[in-house]
């Protein structure tokens, strides 16, 4: 179980927790999230979003970047991104970046 559940919003700054790593698996020829005793194989869209989850960018900035890149409706992309990130957070594969001291 995840030690702390988060609620994802556009203000969130998501990142993978220390125990989870996004890696390209040469054997499977696909991206995977590796965590202790768990492996998740996200689809290509999820991988693109996860690569933007660096703890510095807000969900809002991620949505803006994707909406611009794909010339898509921001509201629709926003709904999908928040739902996907919330699902990963609920499963313990995503956490909120800690505030850093100035």
Swiss-Prot record:
It comes from the Bacteria. The keyword Translocase does not apply. One of its GO terms (molecular function) is quinone binding. Keywords: PQQ biosynthesis. GO terms for biological process: pyrroloquinoline quinone biosynthetic process. Pathway: Cofactor biosynthesis; pyrroloquinoline quinone biosynthesis. Belongs to the PqqD family. Functions as a PqqA binding protein and presents PqqA to PqqE, in the pyrroloquinoline quinone (PQQ) biosynthetic pathway. Monomer. Interacts with PqqE. This is PqqA binding protein.
């Amino acid at each position: 179980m995840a030690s702390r559940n988060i609620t994802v919003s556009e203000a969130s700054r998501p990142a993978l927790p220390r125990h989870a790593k996004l890696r390209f698996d040469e054997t499977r020829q696909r991206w995977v999230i590796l965590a202790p005793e768990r492996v998740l194989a996200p689809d290509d869209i999820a991988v693109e979003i996860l690569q933007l989850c660096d703890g510095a960018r807000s969900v809002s900035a991620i949505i803006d970047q994707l909406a611009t890149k794909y010339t898509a409706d921001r509201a629709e992309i926003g709904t999908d991104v928040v739902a996907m990130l919330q699902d990963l957070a609920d499963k313990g594969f995503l956490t909120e970046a800690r505030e850093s001291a100035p």
